[in-house]
Amino acid sequence: MSRCAGVLMSISSLPSPYGIGTIGKAAYDFADFLKKSGQKIWQILPVGPTSYGDSPYQAFSTYAGNPYMIDLDFLVRDGLLTSKDLEGRKWGENPEEVDYAQIYETRFDVLRCAFKKFRKNNPKFKSFVKENADWLDNYALYMSVKKNNDMKAWTEWEDEDIKLRKPEAIAKYTAKFKSEIEFWKFVQFMFYQQWADFRK
């Protein structure tokens, strides 16, 4: 095995005007810098959606990507947002620290703006949903029910049937939260599109 050098840095530590690093231009620039400086490895922290405490090692899902890492400027480029959608938003007071509470409030509001403009019959989206149904359906339902329960841990949900994943409860909530489930699938589609482009 030949010797090589690398860097350990979380994507969340990249510079960003939106309170936290993303897989946007700063990520590409940093990767280019590493290549030019002879680095062979960029080790990152897990990129799953963080839960209470915002630790990358405590995620809601093994498979899902972190919505915070979706680059909003790329969504503007793709016509899902406008610069006006981002004007006046609060991302935290200290540019050297991540204000997760503020980002949670702001980012999902912005992503919902993008979702409203997204064409649900997009062939790539439909293909993504179909190919990842084994984890995506459950994840999107889980996040929808969790949001309906004020983001409480599933052990604190009021409906025992959905906590136990009884088939009739799954069918009930899948129908009830159809639009919300589509939103969470959209978020994962956006993450994985940007992630795949970056890793090319």
Label every PLM stretch briefly.
Residues 2-200:
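Acidic/aromatic-lined carbohydrate-recognition and catalytic surfaces
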